[in-house]
Amino acid sequence: MVDVILAAAIGLIWGSFIATLVLRWPAGRSVHGRSRCDACGQTLGVRDLVPLLSALARRGRCRHCGAAIDPFHARVELGAAMIGVVALAIVPGPAGWLWAAFVWLLLPLALLDARHLWLPDRLNAVLAAVGLLLAGPMLGTSLLDRWIGALAGGLALALLGWSYRRLRGGEGMGGGDPKLVAAIGCWIGWQALPLMLLLASLSGLVWALATQGKGDRPLAARRVPFGLFACIAAFAAVPLWLWLSGR
């Protein structure tokens, strides 16, 4: 129970940073320095920056000018806290902490792809490096398993993108998608990679069909944030693989 509460607290703090990063980075604004109200520019104090609680206490408004604070902050903080709670409740111990860390690192990538169709190389590199260094106990994979997962995942997506360009004469996949899948392979190894790709493909297809409106472009011509669905699938693949493999 202590681990679950601690994971929720860490998630709230991490979520606060991630929300700031996702809102500022694409706009070319620094993610460092003191936080300010977007409406009045007033520097926010410590009591204004307590994750989730400050927003609840101020009813989602700036203490200085009364302007509404973007609810995106609170949603990301709550989502990151729930990631920690779910991970440690389902998979106690070191494997659960690694699962939580994995998804916390996936969170900014998922949000940036959903909002901007952008998967920054730097975030993919951090995800990959941490996975190669630390992820072994999460699914019981060896370093070789994770290297093979990275190479197989990255090459499979790159080959798929190349084939689409050859057949259709246009881009069917963003350049960050193969790098993201390679980075995910650094965490889950080659064994769970097919499950993750299957879940990502199915969820992306369901989303595309569910959001297809009359008069929209054909499905083949629509831009789907595959990175978002790869992140969601990676989250789900960890407990599913542990269950399927009897670990």
Segment roles from a protein language model:
Residues W14-A19, A80, G84, L134, ...:
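Alpha-helical transmembrane segments of multipass membrane proteins
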Residues G174-G176, L209-A236:
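Interfacial loop-to-transmembrane junctions
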Residues P239-R247:
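Juxtamembrane boundary at the C-terminal end of a transmembrane helix
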Residues A7, W97, A101-W207, G246-R247:
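Functional transmembrane core segments of multi-pass inner-membrane proteins
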Residues F72-A80, G96-A100, G213-F226:
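Hydrophobic alpha-helical transmembrane segments and immediately flanking/interface helices
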Residues V86-L98:
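Transmembrane helix-loop-helix
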Residues I18-R75, F226:
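Membrane-proximal soluble regions of multi-pass membrane proteins
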Residues M1-P26, D121:
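Long, highly hydrophobic alpha-helical transmembrane signal-anchor segments
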